[in-house]
Amino acid sequence: MIPSTAAALLTLTAGAAFAHTGCGGHEIGRRNVGGPMLYRRAVTDEASAAVSTDINTECTAYSYAPVTELISSFPTIWQTASIPSNDTEAQQLFGKINSTLNTKIPNDVPHGTPTGDWTGVNYSNSDPDCWWTHNKCTTPSNDTGLQADISIAPEPMTWGLGFDDGPNCSHNALYDLLLENNQKATMFFIGSNVLDWPLQAMRAHDEGHEICVHTWSHQYMTALSNEVVFAELYYTQKAIKAVLGVTPQCWRPPYGDVDNRVRMIAEGLNLTTIIWSDDTDDWAAGTNGVTEQDVTNNYQSVIDKAGNGTYTTHGPVVLNHELTNYTMSVFMTMFPKIKSAFNYIVPICTAYNITQPYAESNITCPNFETYISGVTNISSSTTQKDGSSSTNTASGSGAAGSASATSSSDDSSSSGGSSGSSGSNNASSGALGMFDSLSGVGLILGGVVAGVMLL
């Protein structure tokens, strides 16, 4: 965040502290696989994928037939999304949203680059676009007609629980812990990961967690054109619908990077923007001088606020990651302390009494009172819900605030998912790939995204 100055315009540079808001300005890293690699058989279904907590076993690549049959209708995994020329449905919807956008906020333009370089960007200190990366703005001006971002839990002494960057192939230990404690969370899924690791995505949904969008390729959204912003969100929604059968109505911008232009496109897709109030920096351990002890201290800082009166009127929404084995393990270590310090730990839909979390009206998220009574699963219902159930009815004083699979790998150092991906053992990973529809054998073509720092 850049301090306010008297200047009307501010030139942003990549080296400024501003570039390190939220996720430290880190970039998605890529590596070469050094040649083709063949898969053999491993997990066969969701249940078998959920058994092992050995990272090498969990992250063995597999082919999931429903994904291989539809992969050609999606953007290339881990590349910037765009609308294919033959997707007339997407083109028509984008045209409608874009027309509204250009009418309401024509002067809100892209900032910087998709990797977070703002060198030479001129932006007014008055923050006309409510640009979170500039000043952590979460409440657009009234004339935009945009809703405020969700950034706190409105109920007192309540931890809003969510995990970014999933599904991760090595998440079984974390999900086992959540299951054993009847604990639900909001999972912010990357579209490329959903198609890479569909069985892992299915576990999250089937065990009653809320699923939200975290874009297709995890880039700084305010740097992207209107069409690319739309495609990054739209095709992630579509991937989640294709694999899980539900259409999310919530999203979190990578790095927190959002402004009114991006918000308006998201709202055109019925997506509510969710940010956070507290950052554990779990993603940063081992980089930029950040130690594992620093991450533990960050967790402890949030826990300490529960004891000093900070959360008597509301609670935090905390940034955690399903990114690496470490980010998941440190949460597991701190979970008993979190439970002891806070009265409640809930997913975001529950915190805001959003009982219809998806476009599909027969799926219900328990409201706050129901959840704390012990009924925690997001589940199907035979009773149809109308759109009014998505209204925020939180009671805290903070409420006004804001099918089978085949696979394996000869080499345990390589992991990947159903779309033909490979990456590091504990990675939220993906790659460009293709599958032989006759033999079910995948051939890595390259472009791997390893277990890298995503927010």
From Swiss-Prot:
UniProt PTM: The GPI anchor is required for the attachment to the cell membrane but not for cell surface targeting.
Needed cofactors: Co(2+)
UniProt subcellular location: Secreted; Secreted, Cell wall; Cell membrane
Residues that, per the record, bind Co(2+): D165, H214, H218
EC number: 3.5.1.41
Entry GO MF terms: chitin binding; chitin deacetylase activity; metal ion binding
A cellular component annotation (GO) from this entry: fungal-type cell wall
Biotechnology: Recombinant CDA2 is a potential vaccine candidiate; induces protective immunity in mice against infection. A strain lacking CDA1, CDA2, and CDA3 is a potential vaccine candidate; inoculation with heat-killed CDA1-CDA2-CDA3 knockout cells in mouse induces protective immunity to subsequent virulent fungal infection.
Chief site of localization: secreted
Lipid attachment in record (GPI-anchor amidated serine): S429
Positions bearing carbohydrate: N86, N98, N122, N142, N168, N270, N308, N325, N353, N362, N377, N426
Induction details: Repressed by the antifungal agent caspofungin.
Domain (NodB homology): residue spans on this chain: 157-347
Coiled coil region boundaries: none
UniProt-listed GO biological process terms: cell wall organization; chitin catabolic process; fungal-type cell wall biogenesis; polysaccharide catabolic process
Role of this protein: Hydrolyzes the N-acetamido groups of N-acetyl-D-glucosamine residues in chitin to form chitosan and acetate. Chitosan is required to anchor melanin to the cell wall, for maintenance of cell wall integrity, and for proper cytokinesis. Chitosan offers an advantage during infection as it is less readily detected than chitin by host immunosurveillance mechanisms.
Family as reported in the entry's similarity comment: Belongs to the polysaccharide deacetylase family.
PANTHER family: CHITIN DEACETYLASE, GLYCOSYL TRANSFERASE-RELATED
Protein's recorded name: Chitin deacetylase 2
